[in-house]
């Protein structure tokens, strides 16, 4: 019997919605990365995008454990000398809710064309509303509540 290898035309991408209220950032990010890659499916093939679409709502209410809200630092550089900027998690969540989650998930995905296609299937919204109701996403529960 030959080893099964999924073809891009044979893969169906489902839509899921996750409510991130009071969930821990890393636990949500790891589960989302696993589902974006498609590793939860029996037809997983490393060189084919077998993952699903993930819509995350209430990303502004994500939590981190310990003192990471002030200690976790995100860096970016403008490209000019001395152009490095540092932002902690609390300020990032205030200005751009959901960007910390996007960065965490992006770091867990492969780098290259396939990884870039996977991250495009992630939709993050700070509030409870999202424009993807036409896709009829299924509710996905993640056990990552902060204690």
UniProtKB/Swiss-Prot annotation:
One of its GO terms (molecular function) is mRNA binding. It comes from the Bacteria. GO terms for cellular component: cytosolic large ribosomal subunit. One of its GO terms (biological process) is translation. Gene3D superfamilies: Ribosomal protein L13 (3.90.1180.10). Transmembrane segments: none annotated. Keywords: Ribonucleoprotein, Ribosomal protein. Part of the 50S ribosomal subunit. Belongs to the universal ribosomal protein uL13 family. This protein is one of the early assembly proteins of the 50S ribosomal subunit, although it is not seen to bind rRNA by itself. It is important during the early stages of 50S assembly. This is Large ribosomal subunit protein uL13. It comes from Polaromonas naphthalenivorans (strain CJ2).
């Amino acid at each position: 019997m030959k080893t099964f290898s999924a073809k891009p035309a044979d893969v169906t991408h489902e839509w899921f919605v996750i409510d991130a209220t009071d969930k821990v950032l890393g636990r949500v990010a790891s589960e989302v990365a696993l589902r974006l890659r498609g590793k939860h499916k029996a037809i997983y093939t490393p060189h084919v995008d077998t993952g699903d679409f993930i819509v995350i709502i209430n990303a502004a209410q994500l939590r981190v454990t310990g003192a990471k809200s002030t200690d976790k630092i995100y860096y970016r550089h403008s490209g000019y000398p001395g152009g490095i900027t540092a932002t902690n998690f609390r300020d990032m969540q205030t200005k751009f809710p959901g960007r910390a989650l996007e960065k965490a998930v992006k770091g867990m995905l492969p780098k290259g064309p396939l990884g870039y296609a996977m991250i495009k299937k992630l939709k993050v919204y700070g509030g409870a509303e999202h424009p993807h109701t036409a896709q009829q996403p299924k509710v996905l529960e993640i056990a990552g509540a902060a204690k």
